[in-house]
Amino acid sequence: MACSIVQFCYFQDLQAARDFLFPHLREEILSGALRRDPSKSTDWEDDGWGAWEENEPQEPEEEGNTCKTQKTSWLQDCVLSLSPTNDLMVIAREQKAVFLVPKWKYSDKGKEEMQFAVGWSGSLNVEEGECVTSALCIPLASQKRSSTGRPDWTCIVVGFTSGYVRFYTENGVLLLAQLLNEDPVLQLKCRTYEIPRHPGVTEQNEELSILYPAAIVTIDGFSLFQSLRACRNQVAKAAASGNENIQPPPLAYKKWGLQDIDTIIDHASVGIMTLSPFDQMKTASNIGGFNAAIKNSPPAMSQYITVGSNPFTGFFYALEGSTQPLLSHVALAVASKLTSALFNAASGWLGWKSKHEEEAVQKQKPKVEPATPLAVRFGLPDSRRHGESICLSPCNTLAAVTDDFGRVILLDVARGIAIRMWKGYRDAQIGWIQTVEDLHERVPEKADFSPFGNSQGPSRVAQFLVIYAPRRGILEVWSTQQGPRVGAFNVGKHCRLLYPGYKIMGLNNVTSQSWQPQTYQICLVDPVSGSVKTVNVPFHLALSDKKSERAKDMHLVKKLAALLKTKSPNLDLVETEIKELILDIKYPATKKQALESILASERLPFSCLRNITQTLMDTLKSQELESVDEGLLQFCANKLKLLQLYESVSQLNSLDFHLDTPFSDNDLALLLRLDEKELLKLQALLEKYKQENTRTNVRFSDDKDGVLPVKTFLEYLEYEKDVLNIKKISEEEYVALGSFFFWKCLHGESSTEDMCHTLESAGLSPQLLLSLLLSVWLSKEKDILDKPQSICCLHTMLSLLSKMKVAIDETWDSQSVSPWWQQMRTACIQSENNGAALLSAHVGHSVAAQISNNMTEKKFSQTVLGADSEALTDSWEALSLDTEYWKLLLKQLEDCLILQTLLHSKGNTQTSKVSSLQAEPLPRLSVKKLLEGGKGGIADSVAKWIFKQDFSPEVLKLANEERDAENPDEPKEGVNRSFLEVSEMEMDLGAIPDLLHLAYEQFPCSLELDVLHAHCCWEYVVQWNKDPEEARFFVRSIEHLKQIFNAHVQNGIALMMWNTFLVKRFSAATYLMDKVGKSPKDRLCRRDVGMSDTAMTSFLGSCLDLLQILMEADVSRDEIQVPVLDTEDAWLSVEGPISIVELALEQKHIHYPLVEHHSILCSILYAVMRFSLKTVKPLSLFDSKGKNAFFKDLTSIQLLPSGEMDPNFISVRQQFLLKVVSAAVQAQHSATKVKDPTEEATPTPFGKDQDWPALAVDLAHHLQVSEDVVRRHYVGELYNYGVDHLGEEAILQVHDKEVLASQLLVLTGQRLAHALLHTQTKEGMELLARLPPTLCTWLKAMDPQDLQNTEVPIATTAKLVNKVIELLPEKHGQYGLALHLIEAVEAISLPSL
């Protein structure tokens, strides 16, 4: 309870505000960074402050010091103001200003804290050369009745060197501007309404006072409040509509010309005061002499105090009623950001007509009223001393003044004299703190001797002066008037102390009573740490040291704290000393604080704590009842009860207790009311769960379950009206407390009955004990599964708890749900430890059935007394609503356990690369999560597991087919070609197929194969969208999409994928490729599409597959019925988001021609990227209709190209398709020369490559290009690359054989020309001489350089010539040439035979 400094707010980015106000500092930093290392980045936002300060000592010392001072002391050169409600802070310098607003944000440590963030920044000057001299943030009260006490809004008042005072909103919108004097504004101060503390204090009016070099203007607070509200409403209306004209009320102000004083620096407006009769006579004698007349009633006067020079402090008194207040017509100013309509509205307020007249009036300065002269009545003359600032105390009785001699002087305002002086405070900043006494903290024994008579008397008020000495970096708190220093803090040399001296404007004696706004009297802004702090001063520090019992008590508390920290071997001595100290403390609140600190000590043993608390309790009981504080007595009694409970539980846990009864499976079956088959099934499930649930728990050797320090025990529990409750503690702490009570009992090492009796008698409710028991059981799953005997202990414990009073209501009916069992079921539903939850549910069901049977037996026996009735056996179970709920829960937990076991299982497949997305751990399941996950929640969790394991879709299909297989070999017949991959993996899958099969059986509806494939497809595409570089995810997604059998589901999923993830990237890729006119480079792909060039190639290929699937699904969906989505009986109550499959079924039908149109574009893009084609602009292959239809909703009907296409388009398209065919043949057969089968083709990075020639023919059909031209070109390219056997096959598909024969004839000529002319062998030359001249001439005209493969055997060429002869009709012009070629080829082949 000492004086403290508290941090309550931080700055989010104070550096940005500094750089805005001081641009030269940023430039210096930048130039300094460049001087140090030119290669480093010059971006000032990327460098931290530490980086700038790192190399400063290397610079010249003076320059370095100057730079450092500028960087840290910049706040001293700014005008600073903080709203007392902490809603707004203004930092201004010259023409610029930054408005900061508080926001709740999470810090780096995850703690929520308030941070000041920049709300607005800009220039405030209207006239050229004017600068800000003073600023105030005034919160204005809300006029609404339902207001909670927060201000409605905050007005920023700014004074300028031009004499203008301007008023702004929090967003920097200028509301109004007033020129009340033509000299610079020196200081703005505000006074708001305060309820008078007692009748002797004069009620003060609200006002805003403005100090000029030779005048003071005071604006009436009520008038200002009304004007500001009207202006703000007008700005809002004008911004919205622009045609509202309302004349705001005029401002009422008084203007006093201060005389007989040289210079004025600062002022304080004390307010209205009334002199006592003696002071009235004294003043009248001083002014009017011996014969002065005196009025019967003392006149009311407004008092002003100024500081400056000659006199150092001047006192002015203005008689109320001596002058009429002046009325200023409010010249509403409008910020340039608002619309021109707002300017029209403003002109309407002032009666302006035209724009020309408006400009003239704006340029002309308003009329300035003359000041009423006011002479200084008296002062403190000190010719050498110059005052710098004055700060009025909250009670208006004292004022603190600073001067240029480094002194702080305390003035008595009423008497006008200096009553105290502090030395050595140069450049001091001052403020006040007013503290009100808390009546509850008074000593009861002393209440009767108090001057107030009883503890219900009025609260006393204390005033403390706060002085910040920046030269020494110290903040001091002094008790006034003559009190000691009560607090001192080292805060740094570059802070600013802010003392507003006012609260909220617009309150009165009625509204201020209901308002209790959170206001800060004083704040310290620290720019170095970027924090805002306030000072808390307890009232008792104002009491004198010698007489203060509280000061003595605080001394004893400090002594006690020091004693608790010391390590003493003699604990008895320490205990005795602590007892003496706590009994010596007088105040009950302090005594309670001391006892709390003792009980929180870790060094004192339990016996010490018990003895000290018992001693204090005995002492309090021995005193008179009236003088004992009831709260302290109750506190002691409660702590003593807790200590006794701790002792009892510790003793029970330490006893050597063991259950010697043997425990068999048969006993367990009877206990859980299960038959042998059910028990074996349960054990098998739990065994699988244990094997797969391989989570490693970190355990330390000194960690012991069931042990809890007494300090922690006392922190967790509290008594409230004789009922023991648990405080709000974390889950781990809750488990620790439960372990302390029940862990030994669950292990059979402590008496269960004794423990239950002890806890019940201590006041713990059965519901609370059940909650603790279940928290322990469910959190210690690993230990419980390893020790089946603990099930018996849980059964015993649960039975005992259920038999306690108020556990199960006696009036409970079997047809209603028991809250007791519902509590247990809820805990099992919420638990993520499914093994422990399933076991506890079985135990709960067994105990519930036993109790229900007993109750039913009682009722039954009462009904049929005297009659022969069959004895009710344990095997018989009374039917009740609870029983049905238990059975449902057991089924749900069993399902959840199987699912969790599956999700924990891992295959040993060695994938080449594991993505970071796949490495993320899966969340653990609980029944609650599955019930809240919606209908698709189960399939979604399995899909996430499949993604993590990256299984092939065939694995899911294989596990599903095993469901109906008679033997293991049968399903393998139906698996398609990619089964080879599965069979290779199958050896490493382990138990996964069995677990999957079990999950399919358990969830026949939720894990139906189409549903699972749909969720897997969606999961893969979602993960791909997070990291588009992982193209294999998208490929896998398409694989799952292909596996979906139902066309309705397939269509919906594909359409959702396209709209959600693909169309934006697809359109970006299209526009990029169209812009560059070729296959774009990696950098451009990453910039525009967000993935690399190789990933984009795969992306386009997968998009093409997806569009093909969409079209196929649209065709086949009419033949297939819409699937009915069922849910398992146990999971009918699921709630939550709609499943992916349900969303898919809601999708509209696609417009088939539009999808086909997109697939054509996709094929073109894919070809360009796949073969790195150049000089291709994809969109240039389409007319305007075709271009406009792209990237529209695939379900919408668009205007598509129809009819005959422009021949120019067809020509361009044909060239493109021939390019694709050439590139495809080149990619496939360019490596045949090497004859390496592994390099036969260059497949796409992911998946199987397309059949490009067939795709090109298909595209030709859709693009209105002759398909035969493409086929002929394909044949020609095959022969060109020397793949004659494939060429012969391809010839069969060509229709116009004659044209093809002509093309092949040329190719044959090129081959012969290369063989005869370019090899230039002797035999070749001789043969050439024997050839007919026409053939010779034709061969010489051939260019063999066009041939891609010149090493074709002559026998193969001979076959080609024969093929040409077959294709050419005899009447063809080149038939004779072909016959000559046959002879030439035969002649060439003869020498080789």
UniProtKB/Swiss-Prot annotation:
Effect of R426C: In MARTS1; abolishes GEF activity towards RAB18
Residues with PTM Phosphoserine: S39, S450, S916, S978
Family matches, as InterPro entries: Rab3GAP2 (IPR026059), RAB3GAP2_C (IPR029257), RAB3GAP_N (IPR032839)
A GO term from the CC aspect: protein-containing complex
Region annotation Disordered: where it falls in the sequence: 36-67
Key word Phosphoprotein present: yes
Subcellular location: Cytoplasm; Endoplasmic reticulum
Described function: Regulatory subunit of the Rab3 GTPase-activating (Rab3GAP) complex composed of RAB3GAP1 and RAB3GAP2, which has GTPase-activating protein (GAP) activity towards various Rab3 subfamily members (RAB3A, RAB3B, RAB3C and RAB3D), RAB5A and RAB43, and guanine nucleotide exchange factor (GEF) activity towards RAB18. As part of the Rab3GAP complex, acts as a GAP for Rab3 proteins by converting active RAB3-GTP to the inactive form RAB3-GDP. Rab3 proteins are involved in regulated exocytosis of neurotransmitters and hormones.
Associated disease: Martsolf syndrome 1: An autosomal recessive disease characterized by congenital cataracts, intellectual disability, and hypogonadism.
UniProt protein name: Rab3 GTPase-activating protein non-catalytic subunit
Biological classification of the source: Eukaryota, Metazoa, Chordata, Craniata, Vertebrata
Gene name in the database record: RAB3GAP2
